C-alpha cells in the first residue's frame, strides 16, 4: 500500500522527469503543466568569475523555447534525485547530459509545480 508521503515523493519525481522530457521532446504543453507561472530559472553568466551576473529565464520564456521543438542533440535521459521534502515543498537534483539542475517545487492544491531552478552545463 502506498501512503500519502510515498505518493508525494512519486509526484515530485514525476514532475521533475516531465520537465526534462518535455525539454528533450519539444513539448510546450507538458512543460507548462509543471511550471509555476512565476518560475525563475537561473545560471551564473560566467561561472567561476568574480562578476555577479546571472542569466534568467521565466516560465513563459522556457515554454517559448520548447515551442520551437526538441532542444538538444544529445541522448535524452536524466537521473532524478529527491534531496529533501517537507509537507508542501521539495528539492530535487536532476543530472542529464546537457545540464545539472537543482529544482525547488511547491504544492498547490493537489499539484506539485517547479518554482525555482538553478542549473549549469553538465
Predicted regions: what they are:
Residues 27, 32, 76-78, 105:
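Preference for short coil/turn "hinge" residues that link or interrupt alpha-helices
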Residues 4-11, 40-100:
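Surface-exposed, charged secondary-structure patches
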Residues 91-93, 100-122:
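Short beta-strand edge/turn micro-motifs at domain boundaries
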Residues 1-29, 33, 37-38, 54-56:
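Short, low-complexity N-terminal intrinsically disordered segments enriched in polar/charged residues
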Amino acid at each position: 500500500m502506498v501512503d500519502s508521503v510515498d505518493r508525494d515523493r512519486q509526484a515530485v519525481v514525476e514532475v521533475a522527469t516531465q520537465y526534462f522530457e518535455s525539454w528533450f521532446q519539444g513539448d510546450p504543453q507538458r512543460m507548462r503543466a509543471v511550471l509555476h507561472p512565476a518560475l525563475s530559472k537561473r545560471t551564473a553568466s560566467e561561472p567561476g568569475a568574480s562578476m555577479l551576473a546571472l542569466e534568467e529565464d521565466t516560465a513563459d520564456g522556457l515554454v517559448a523555447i520548447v515551442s520551437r521543438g526538441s532542444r538538444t542533440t544529445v541522448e535524452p535521459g536524466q537521473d532524478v534525485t529527491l534531496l529533501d521534502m517537507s509537507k508542501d515543498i521539495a528539492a530535487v537534483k536532476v543530472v542529464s547530459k546537457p545540464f545539472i539542475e537543482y529544482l525547488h517545487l511547491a504544492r498547490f492544491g493537489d499539484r506539485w509545480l517547479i518554482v525555482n531552478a538553478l542549473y549549469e552545463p553538465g
